[in-house]
Structure formats: C-alpha cells, structure tokens
Amino acid sequence: MTLKSGRGGGGGSGSMRTALSDLYLEHLLQNRAKPEAIAQAPNAMTEDIYTNGSATLGSPSHSNGREVRKIRLVQFEKVTEEPMGITLKLNDKQSCMVARIFHGGMIHRQGSLHVGDEIIEINGQSVSNHSVDQLQKMLKETQGMVSIKVIPNQQSRLPALQMFMRAQFDYDPKKDNLIPCKEAGLKFQTGDVIQIINKDDSNWWQGRVEGSGTESAGLIPSPELQEWRVASVTQSSQSEAQSCSPFGKKKKYKDKYLAKHSSIFDQLDVVSYEEVVRLPAFKRKTLVLIGASGVGRSHIKNALLSNNPEKFMYPPPYTTRPQKKNEVDGKDYYFVSTEEMTRDISANEFLEFGSYQGNMFGTKFETVHKIHQQDKVAILDIEPQTLKIVRTAELSPFIVFIAPTDKAEESEALQQLRKDSESIRSRYAHYFDLSIVNNGVEESLKLLEEAFEQACSSPQWVPVSWVY
C-alpha cells in the first residue's frame, strides 16, 4: 500500500497519521475474532462454600445474621515437576495473598486462581504463621491431588491486555540484582517486540517476546523501574567523574545543531520501551543511512541513486556558501543568503543544519516532502542525533546503520572507526531497523535493497505515535 502525505510539516504529519490509523483500524476489524490458543493444563475443580465466621460451612442462607464469607475450594492433580506459576505475599494483616500469576503457567492455564485471592489452606494445612518462603516451598513440593482453599478477590477482572512494546535495551535477568526471582525473568535484546501480559506490579511487568514460539511469560522491569535504574547509574557516574576531575564539569562544543532539539536534551533522554502496533504492509517513504564518518555511507547512497534513479532521490541541501560555476541552483544545492537561512532555521523548517568553514548547510523538510510527492523514496544520510526528529509518521523512515568492515586488515584508522561506530550503536541502536556490516558496496547494496523491499511488502511494527 502506498501512502501519501500532504504538504507542510503539520499537514503532512496529520494526513499520514490518519492513513496509518485507518490501516490499523481495518487490520483490527479483520482480526478481532481470532482467539489465541493456550496450551492445556490439568483441569481444576472449584466449589464455592460459605462461612459465617464459625467452623461450620454451608450455604449463605444459614448465616444467622452474621457476615458471610465465600470460600472457594480449588482442587487439581499435579503430576509433573512443572511449577504452578504463582508467587505469594503477606499483606498488612499477614494474610497470604496471590501476588502474581505467570502467563502461560499451570495456574494461568487453569484459570483457578486470581491475583488478590487470599489463600487459607493448602492441602488441609493452615497457612497462618508461615513465611512467604515456607508457603512457596509448600506449593512447590506438593504432588498428586492438590487442595487449596481461598477467599476469592471480588474485584472485577480486567480484560486481557493488548499492548506491545519494543525493547530499547538489552536485558538479562541473571545479571539483575533487583529482580525478585531471576528464574522468572525474561531475557530480551534491543529491538525485540514484547507482548505485555500483566502490569499490575508497578516495578515488574509480565511479558513474552513476540515470535519466540513460547506462551509462557516472564518478568521484565517496568519502564519506571528501568528509567530510574539508568538515571541512577548515570547520576552516579557523573558524580564520580566530577570528583575525579581537577577542573570539575567541562563543557563540550558541538558544531552540529538540530531543529527543535539539542544535544543536551538528547543526553538527558532515558530509554526503556516504546509502545508499538503491528500494521499491514505499507510503503516506507524515507531511507535513512546512519554511520560513523568514513564508514562508506556516501558510496552506498550514490550507488542507490545511480542504480535506481526512478525509485530513490536525494534532497539537495541548502547552503549560504557562494555558488560555483558548474553548480545548478536547486539541483546540487539551494543557494540562499545567511539572513534567509537563519530565518528559516528559527521557523523550524530544517530537520538538520550545521556549519562548515564559515558557511551554513542544512536539509529542509520541504525538499523531502517534494520527493515524496513524486512517489519516490527520499535518502537521508544524517547525524544520529537527528533520528528522533525524522522518526515520525510524516516521514515513515526505514533506518539503516552502516557498521565498518570486519574483513579488512587491522589499522589504527579502522580501530578508531570501530570505536566511533560502537559509540553510535550503543546509544542509538533502538532506532535501527537494520544493521549492515559494510564489507563492500555491492554486498551492502544487495542486503539493504532486499531488507527495504521486505519492510515495504510485509506487516510491520511501528511506533504507536504513528497511528494515534
């Protein structure tokens, strides 16, 4: 499907988002009646019984004016070593409560217990005066017929979540000292799409990696917890760095400036997850090439333009430098006065701009829109700080990171290039749709073109902000 946007920043963004919203709504309507299959678990028998506070159990009609409590008797046979998939906690009254139910686990598949249920007995043994560890061990070691008495949580059950998040960091629960149970954690990598199953716990959500082939969920740090963790580490590192420096805090000057954002704001940006939705195939309008200086982006860009002039186009930059004899205004560059360029920068008409040898250079949103209006793909080779600006429904970019060769003879220059590339990758990898090791223009072109076509012809995960 080819989607077109109108002119101008605001109008283009709005119309493109509307088109993607319509596409998403159509997708939801077509798939709303497809139930998710869940692996079967041993059947559980439940029976509701009532008590008026005495030891006698019966029906609610025999309450004799006393407060009636409903107690549920849950019975099932446990014949394997599979964990039940629940965690317990003691509330303020020292009552044993179901704290968490793991999606895909035995209890979840049975539907026999719910978060907030109060457990009274396990196999006829009262849970009073037991620690959480003792109770968890009791559940783990039970075999054969299991009988649990609970006071059901009377709060309404919320419908299952339909939320998907793209991970913006790597996570290994075995290396996490904060997680309450390392074995229950979910390992994932940057770029993995995680279906969020439960987020009742403000610190630890439950999720599963989409496409992993398993129904079982694991614990993941919530966005709030992860952002707190990263901010704490960053603050600690900055404090240590300042205390070690005889000059205190140093200021860094950058010659590259970005419209609407600055490098200072970028440094304060803490990433965790990004909510995404799955859309049917649609055309990506912009191809963005990211990489360290000297990695070969220009060679790849020029080869794309030369091999596919009917498909790809590069937006001519604006500049305040004098026009040379062999240059055509509007083809090689747009030549403007310093006053005009300064005015347009103030009006946020540039997606990126900077200066070189006393002259200003920059790329306008308008020139990118003109390429889209010709039904062509705009190629941008920009600084990584600009990614958050171009990653919008308006531009619908496919972002490719170009990494240095891993086959060339080792040299000091190559070592520096790899160091610069790793610095970009570690900071901006959560934006990348594709990473390519540039072992040659021809090989890189083949990989890039195949991946771009695949992205435009198959369902895609996109930021939820592109749709709503």
From Swiss-Prot:
<dbReference type="GO" id="GO:0034451">
    <property type="term" value="C:centriolar satellite"/>
</dbReference>
<dbReference type="GO" id="GO:0016740">
    <property type="term" value="F:transferase activity"/>
</dbReference>
<dbReference type="InterPro" id="IPR020590">
    <property type="entry name" value="Guanylate_kinase_CS"/>
</dbReference>
<protein>
    <recommendedName>
        <fullName>55 kDa erythrocyte membrane protein</fullName>
    </recommendedName>
</protein>
<dbReference type="InterPro" id="IPR035475">
    <property type="entry name" value="MPP1_SH3"/>
</dbReference>
<dbReference type="GO" id="GO:0032420">
    <property type="term" value="C:stereocilium"/>
</dbReference>
<dbReference type="InterPro" id="IPR036028">
    <property type="entry name" value="SH3-like_dom_sf"/>
</dbReference>
<dbReference type="InterPro" id="IPR008145">
    <property type="entry name" value="GK/Ca_channel_bsu"/>
</dbReference>
<dbReference type="InterPro" id="IPR050716">
    <property type="entry name" value="MAGUK"/>
</dbReference>
<keyword id="KW-0728">SH3 domain</keyword>
<dbReference type="GO" id="GO:0005102">
    <property type="term" value="F:signaling receptor binding"/>
</dbReference>
<keyword id="KW-0808">Transferase</keyword>
<dbReference type="InterPro" id="IPR027417">
    <property type="entry name" value="P-loop_NTPase"/>
</dbReference>
<keyword id="KW-0472">Membrane</keyword>
<dbReference type="Pfam" id="PF00625">
    <property type="entry name" value="Guanylate_kin"/>
</dbReference>
<dbReference type="GO" id="GO:0030863">
    <property type="term" value="C:cortical cytoskeleton"/>
</dbReference>
<dbReference type="InterPro" id="IPR036034">
    <property type="entry name" value="PDZ_sf"/>
</dbReference>
<dbReference type="GO" id="GO:0090022">
    <property type="term" value="P:regulation of neutrophil chemotaxis"/>
</dbReference>
<dbReference type="Pfam" id="PF07653">
    <property type="entry name" value="SH3_2"/>
</dbReference>
<comment type="similarity">
    <text>Belongs to the MAGUK family.</text>
</comment>
<keyword id="KW-0449">Lipoprotein</keyword>
<dbReference type="InterPro" id="IPR001452">
    <property type="entry name" value="SH3_domain"/>
</dbReference>
<dbReference type="InterPro" id="IPR001478">
    <property type="entry name" value="PDZ"/>
</dbReference>
<keyword id="KW-0564">Palmitate</keyword>
<feature type="domain" description="SH3">
    <location>
        <begin position="160"/>
        <end position="230"/>
    </location>
</feature>
<feature type="domain" description="PDZ">
    <location>
        <begin position="73"/>
        <end position="154"/>
    </location>
</feature>
<dbReference type="GO" id="GO:0005911">
    <property type="term" value="C:cell-cell junction"/>
</dbReference>
<comment type="function">
    <text>May play a role in the regulation of neutrophil polarization.</text>
</comment>
<keyword id="KW-0966">Cell projection</keyword>
<dbReference type="Pfam" id="PF00595">
    <property type="entry name" value="PDZ"/>
</dbReference>
<dbReference type="GO" id="GO:0005886">
    <property type="term" value="C:plasma membrane"/>
</dbReference>
<feature type="domain" description="Guanylate kinase-like">
    <location>
        <begin position="284"/>
        <end position="453"/>
    </location>
</feature>
<dbReference type="InterPro" id="IPR008144">
    <property type="entry name" value="Guanylate_kin-like_dom"/>
</dbReference>
